[in-house]
């Protein structure tokens, strides 16, 4: 190509900081057009290193090919149309400047490749490709002597101008071609791969738009086209947005990077929509694509700006590893105003990476919505939230914060969730937890501390998970947790699955009617220095054989106040609680609940190992079919159990057909020993099955099936034990405990 004339008339432009600068040596671009790119022998328009200026309307049909550092100034009112785009390959830097920050005044650059080229596939790719070319960026280059080259990417800097770009299939609008290798060849030493490297894209100002690839015919789900960043399968690369207005729409990922690449947003007004279906043949097809985030591994960091990101199809609003999870993927938010949505699966903000992956939120005003099986904020790794103002919801089976289902409808469990401080302004979910697992999922650990959570709302679990999890732990410390949900069936409020630990410390928990605090089999519960209003605190597991029996290892309540409507312990066929420890606490039955049942120990079909109550106040006037303190109705166990009440005040009513303290009616086998010392105890036996029945306040039913009472010891205590005189009566009289003549119980 002949040398172009150089102009020396001073021309101004705005630099990356918006300051006016002057250029005094540049080339003014002029139009070069033909009806078709195929009419050119040389289909490339070389731009050697230097400065170029666009004045008025300029159209160039061949693909512009940068060499070295190429700077382009768009004067006010100008418009450069690069019909076949601008090639920026490795080693090249392409920088765009404008003269104004006003969108209506600043110069324009359009690099939208034709969508209707070679639809009949009559042009061989070696003549001119119909895929693999970016609007601005690297290409699949099929030139003589360079056949098979898929270029690594160069450096693109946009400081101003009104930029509009669209690439081909298998390419970016702004970025590069889609390929893992630049080239592949076989030699006598084996196969040789040359990995394709991503480039650097920086947007400091201007208005930048990318259009989603579209076809009038064909299967849209086979299209691999992205907006801004390294196209799929490249390595590394970066996108940095410091200012300006960015509107990125793409068939797949709207703003993206290669394996292990980075996306950083420090400012500007950014809108990113991935998974856009602009295909006339089938507008209902679901396309995979993230709003902001890579195909696989990498990082997204948002430090400021206004960001709106969504995945219309399968993908993350902000995040990545939507298909494979071959490496680490992280999302970090340190500031900004952010709206994110995932419309089908994955998460509005999240990841599915391997290794040191996760989501960290330190600040920012964030609205995140997960629809379908998506989470609001989700991760396969660690979620850590220590600052900001969050409004989060999940409208399907995903958790508001936690687990989700991926693009293949496979459940993704979160490794850990940490929330510190009053960061959540509003949170709700449908079938997943507000904080925890997706429906049927689990979490490795959850820690919520120093937080006054907003009113929680969900159809199922509020906090936690319901699936088995080896060694899972949920800790709530120095928090206030409340919900005003109106429920018609028993629903877990705070829940962990089997083999897990639940710890509540220095907290206030207010759960509505029918919401309880529950752990799965072989787990444990500890409540310390807390105030709880709950349906119950318990394990509820039913199995069909004793060999599969589930156990609550330990239930500890220390220095706490508990208002409950049901069990504190374990229930379910063949279930048991090994140890109940109550220290310095007040436990009362919530008499507002219609069922008014409460048991400390074994609930229905549940047994216990030991119950140790010290320095506490217990008020349970109506335990239903179970004892207030002891085992449950129809409990089966074959061991010796122990009840100890020391330095406490206890008022308990009797179970139906059973005592208040001891063995419930219908229980079988085993033996219970009872020790009361330094305490004041009032116990009333339950209703009689017949007028000949004898049901004491402490002990067992004299007729019918019940576990044995081994020994009752009363030391330095005031104990009043009553029984009803007749069936359905109201007149209580002292039973024979004080004479040591209770039926079926040996004297000391």
What are these regions (language model features)?
Residues 78:
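Catalytic-site microenvironment of enzymes
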Residues 399, 433:
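Substrate-binding N-lobe of the ribokinase-like
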Residues 3-71, 474, 478-479, 488-489, ...:
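N-terminal domain-start segments of secreted/luminal proteins
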Residues 46-49, 63-72, 87-170, 174-312, ...:
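Surface-exposed loop/turn motifs in large extracellular/passenger domains
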Residues 1-2, 748:
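Accessible peptide chain termini
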């Amino acid at each position: 190509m002949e040398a172009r004339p150089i102009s020396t008339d001073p021309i101004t432009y705005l630099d990356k900081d918006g300051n006016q600068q002057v250029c005094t040596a540049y080339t003014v671009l002029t139009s070069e057009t033909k009806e078709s790119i195929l009419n050119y022998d040389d289909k490339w328009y070389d731009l050697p290193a230097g400065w170029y200026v666009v004045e008025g309307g300029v159209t160039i049909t061949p693909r512009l090919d940068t060499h070295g550092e190429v700077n382009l100034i768009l004067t006010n009112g100008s418009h450069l149309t690069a019909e076949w785009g601008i090639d920026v390959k490795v080693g090249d830097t392409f920088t765009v400047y404008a003269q104004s920050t006003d969108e209506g005044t600043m110069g324009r650059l359009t690099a939208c490749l034709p969508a209707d080229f070679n639809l009949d596939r009559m042009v061989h790719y070696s003549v001119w490709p119909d895929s693999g070319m970016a609007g601005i960026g690297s290409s699949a280059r099929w030139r003589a002597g360079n056949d098979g080259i898929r270029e690594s990417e160069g450096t693109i800097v946009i400081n101003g101008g009104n930029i509009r770009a669209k690439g081909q299939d298998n390419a970016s609008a702004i970025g590069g071609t889609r390929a893992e290798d630049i080239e592949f060849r076989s030699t006598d030493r084996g196969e040789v791969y040359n990995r394709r490297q991503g480039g650097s894209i920086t947007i400091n100002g201007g208005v930048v738009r990318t259009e989603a690839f579209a076809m009038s015919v064909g299967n849209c789900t086979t299209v691999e086209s992205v907006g801004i960043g390294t196209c799929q399968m490249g390595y590394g690369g970066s996108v940095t947005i410091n200012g300006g207005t960015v509107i990125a729409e793409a068939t797949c990922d709207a703003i993206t990077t290669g394996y292990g690449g980075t996306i950083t947003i420090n400012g500007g007004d950014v809108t990113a929509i991935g998974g856009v279906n602009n295909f006339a043949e089938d507008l209902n097809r679901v396309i995979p694509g993230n709003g902001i985030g890579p195909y696989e591994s990498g990082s997204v960091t948002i430090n400021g700006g206004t960001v709106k990101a969504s995945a219309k199809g399968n993908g993350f609003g902000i995040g990545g590893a939507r298909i494979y999870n071959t490496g680490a993927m992280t999302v970090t938010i340190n500031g900004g105003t952010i709206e994110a949505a995932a419309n089908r699966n994955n998460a509005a903000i999240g990841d599915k990476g391997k290794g040191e992956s996760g989501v960290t939120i330190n600040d920012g005003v964030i609205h995140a919505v997960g629809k379908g099986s998506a989470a609001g904020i989700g991760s396969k790794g660690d979620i850590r939230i220590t600052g900001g103002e969050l409004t989060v919801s999940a409208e399907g089976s995903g958790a508001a914060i936690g687990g989700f289902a991926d693009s293949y409808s496979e459940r993704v469990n979160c490794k850990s969730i940490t929330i510190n401080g009053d960061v959540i302004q509003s949170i709700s979910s449908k079938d997943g937890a507000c904080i925890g697992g997706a429906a049927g999922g689990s979490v490795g650990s959850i820690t919520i501390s120093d937080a006054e959570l907003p009113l929680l709302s969900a159809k199922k679990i509020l906090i936690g998970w319901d699936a088995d999890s080896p060694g899972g732990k949920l800790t709530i410390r120095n928090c206030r947790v409340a919900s005003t949900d109106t429920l018609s069936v028993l629903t877990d409020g705070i829940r962990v699955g089997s083999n897990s630990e639940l710890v509540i410390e220095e907290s206030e928990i207010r759960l509505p009617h029918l919401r309880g605090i529950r752990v799965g089999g072989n787990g444990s519960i500890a409540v310390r220095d807390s105030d709880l209003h709950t349906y119950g605190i318990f394990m509820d597991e039913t199995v069909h054989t004793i060999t599969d029996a589930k156990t609550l290892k330990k239930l500890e309540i220390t220095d706490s106040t508990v208002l409950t409507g049901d069990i504190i312990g374990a229930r379910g066929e063949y279930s048991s609680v090994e140890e109940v420890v109550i220290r310095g606490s007040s436990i009362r039955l919530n008499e507002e609940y219609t069922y008014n049942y409460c048991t400390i120990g074994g609930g229905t079909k549940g047994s216990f190992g030991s119950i140790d109550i010290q320095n506490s106040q217990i008020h349970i006037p109506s335990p239903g079919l179970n004892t207030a303190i002891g085992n449950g109705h129809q409990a089966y166990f074959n061991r010796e159990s122990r009840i100890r009440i020391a330095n406490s005040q206890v008022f308990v009513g009797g179970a139906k057909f059973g005592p208040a303290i001891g063995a419930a009616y219908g229980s079988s086998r085993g033996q219970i020993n009872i020790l009361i010392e330094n305490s004041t105890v009032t116990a009333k036996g339950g209703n009689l099955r017949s007028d000949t029945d004898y049901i004491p306040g402490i002990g067992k039913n004299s007729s019918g099936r019940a576990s044995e009472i081994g020994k009752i010891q009363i030391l330095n205590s005031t104990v009043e034990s009553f029984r009803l005189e007749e069936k359905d009566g109201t007149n209580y009289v002292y039973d024979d405990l004080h004479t040591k003549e209770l039926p079926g119980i040996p004297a000391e």
